[in-house]
């Protein structure tokens, strides 16, 4: 205590007081929380010691900073924590006086609180007293969650049963004397976000019995219509009566409406504060790719894989999501999932002219069965392959299909791309990473946009995108030409992309001359049928493709129904009304497809 100078008392509670102090050497302000032990019950004493031990172990950028702690003369537990100049959220709501917070600010606060709770829940810690007066604001209006006096450490499958907390923020299962878990904190957080949004408590009554009745029935007033439907629905999902139907903190962080704010937090957070893994730097989080106007430029890409799980989401800027298109996956703190964000400049497609030629070097990613960093192997320094793009309309969209595939396997276009094989590329053979120049619409199960779904051609095994060349060096090297044409429809705009790959086999070696002859025959047959290949699209007369499309539609509809997203389900099924598509015809061709498949 000799190291600190007491400035003033800033708070007082039933079990102690809070003092504003200044460190004599650092000249920095802190908060001294003194919890009285004398004339207290054993439970209160245990709670004070537990808070001291717990706050000393947690480390998260959105939880109050721990500085020091000690027991003073056996009568007080003293805890030194970081000082938040912005006060607590309850004071901020009172100062608002009818002037609502912006949705952007509320979403940022919600993401920070969810990350704090996700960190606690991943470490089996229940806060049990999440309320606006325990949410503090820093000078730059960032969130700090504090007051762990009622926190409880659970075992892996344990539940809490003690009725503790603030009545207005208690969940229905706690009031019903039912054992509760981490979803109780989600309910309390939902009450806080509701209060921050509506500037009034979610549940308020004149007596305790009426309050309990409102909470158990989960009766809340409508939120202000100035906020988007997605944001209001997100708050309502946190206030569902059944804890099984409430999303967890990790699931809420993956909600499409919060993705821009999650990305901002990842970029701003320090690696030392447990949001970004220590082996990654914030600079590596987002890689922008732009092409200069010169006709020749060299692009060097580098990709790392931290496990055998790959989560890729293509997103496109929209009025509601004003941020750079990114490929991202969100780190789940309870597991060892990797965080990989790749940002693609939107101007990439527009800057590539119809006759611009550029060279690329790509790397092959070795997939390992365990969650260990995989090796990145780059190809030797050779003459890089040349790729030319002809732009027919204002945009280009390229798709990629695996080279090695079985005869009957047809991948649905909406599924994620498979990982590259662990095969090391040979000299003279180069693969082109089209994903690095790809601009794709935002189409996902969690955020359906029917008008943005592109029609991807379902390539078959006899239509490989690149022709592998295995040839022994001959006295007079002959370049092989492989022409690949694919036609893709996106936003009512026809795009034809021509891939011309020239492989100079000066250093390449083959095992026999048969490989070279087969490659030449395949190239000639490809050139002969290029006209018909250019026009390939989704074949509406194909029973198998239509059956797969309908299967995907039904799966999509079932998932929307299960998540109670009825508005999006209505948009999805609207084209299949009585005046739109005949259910009878649909049943006929579906039955035919089943019969043919059975044969």
UniProtKB/Swiss-Prot annotation:
Its EC number is 2.7.11.1. Residues 511-530 have a biased composition (Low complexity). SUPFAM superfamilies: Protein kinase-like (PK-like). It catalyses: L-seryl-[protein] + ATP = O-phospho-L-seryl-[protein] + ADP + H(+); L-threonyl-[protein] + ATP = O-phospho-L-threonyl-[protein] + ADP + H(+). ATP binds at residues 10-18, 33. It comes from the Eukaryota. Residues 4-258 form the Protein kinase domain. It is an enzyme of class 2 (transferase). Expressed in anthers, pistils and leaves. The active site is at 129 (proton acceptor). One of its GO terms (molecular function) is protein serine kinase activity. The keyword Acetylation does not apply. This is Serine/threonine-protein kinase Nek1. It comes from Oryza sativa subsp. japonica (Rice). The gene is NEK1.
């Amino acid at each position: 205590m000799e190291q600190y100078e007491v400035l003033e008392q800033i708070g007082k509670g039933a079990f102690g007081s809070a003092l504003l102090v200044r460190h004599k050497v650092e000249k920095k302000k802190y908060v001294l929380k003194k919890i009285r032990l004398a004339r207290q019950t054993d439970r209160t004493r245990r709670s004070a010691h537990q808070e001291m031990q717990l706050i000393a172990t947690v480390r998260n950028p959105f939880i109050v900073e721990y500085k020091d702690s000690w027991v003073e003369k056996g009568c007080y537990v003293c805890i030194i924590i970081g000082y938040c100049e912005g006060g607590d959220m309850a004071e901020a709501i009172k100062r608002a006086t009818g002037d609502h917070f912006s949705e952007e600010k509320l979403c940022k606060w919600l993401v920070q609180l969810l990350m704090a709770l996700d960190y606690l829940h991943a470490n089996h810690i229940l806060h049990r007293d999440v309320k606006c007066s325990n949410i503090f604001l820093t000078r730059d209006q960032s969130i700090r969650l504090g007051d762990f006096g009622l926190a409880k450490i659970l075992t892996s499958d344990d539940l809490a049963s003690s009725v503790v907390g603030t009545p207005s923020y208690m969940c229905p299962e706690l009031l019903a004397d039912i054992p509760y878990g981490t979803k109780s904190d989600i309910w309390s957080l939902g009450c806080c976000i509701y209060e921050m949004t509506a500037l009034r408590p979610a549940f308020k009554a004149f007596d305790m019995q009426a309050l309990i009745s409102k909470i158990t029935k989960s009766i809340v007033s409508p939120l202000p219509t100035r906020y988007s439907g997605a944001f209001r629905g997100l708050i309502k999902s946190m206030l569902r009566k059944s804890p099984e139907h409430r999303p967890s903190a990790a699931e809420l962080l993956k909600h499409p409406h919060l993705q821009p704010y999650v990305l901002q937090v990842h970029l701003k957070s320090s690696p030392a504060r447990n949001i970004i893994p220590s082996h990654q730097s914030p600079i590596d989080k987002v890689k922008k790719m732009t092409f200069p106007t010169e006709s020749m430029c060299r692009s060097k890409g580098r990709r790392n894989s931290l496990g055998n799980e790959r989560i890729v989401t293509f997103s496109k800027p929209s009025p509601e999501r004003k941020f750079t298109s990114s490929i991202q996956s969100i780190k789940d703190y309870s597991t060892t999932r990797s965080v990989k964000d790749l940002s693609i400049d939107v101007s990439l497609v527009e800057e590539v002219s119809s006759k611009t030629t550029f060279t690329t070097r790509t790397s092959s990613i070795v997939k390992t069965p365990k969650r260990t960093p995989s090796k990145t192997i780059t190809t030797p320094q050779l003459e890089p392959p040349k790729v030319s793009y002809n732009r027919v309309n204002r945009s280009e969209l390229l798709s990629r299909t695996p080279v090695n595939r079985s005869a009957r396997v047809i991948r649905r276009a909406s599924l994620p791309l498979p990982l590259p094989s662990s095969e090391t590329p040979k000299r003279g053979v180069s693969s082109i990473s089209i994903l690095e120049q790809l601009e794709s619409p935002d189409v996902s199960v969690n955020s359906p946009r029917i008008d943005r779904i592109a029609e991807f051609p379902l390539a078959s095994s006899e239509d490989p995108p690149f022709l592998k060349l295995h040839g022994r060096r001959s006295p007079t090297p002959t370049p092989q030409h492989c022409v690949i044409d694919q036609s893709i429809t996106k936003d009512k705009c026809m795009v034809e992309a021509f891939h011309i790959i020239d492989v100079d086999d000066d250093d390449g070696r083959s095992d026999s001359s048969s490989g070279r002859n087969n490659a030449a025959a395949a190239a000639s047959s490809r050139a002969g049928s290029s006209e018909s290949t250019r026009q390939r699209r989704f074949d509406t007369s194909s029973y198998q493709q239509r059956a797969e499309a309908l299967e995907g539609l039904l799966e999509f509809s079932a998932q929307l129904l299960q998540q109670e997203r009825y508005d999006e389900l209505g948009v999805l099924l609207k084209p299949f009304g009585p005046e739109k598509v005949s259910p009878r015809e649909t049943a006929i061709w579906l039955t035919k497809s089943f019969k043919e498949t059975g044969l």
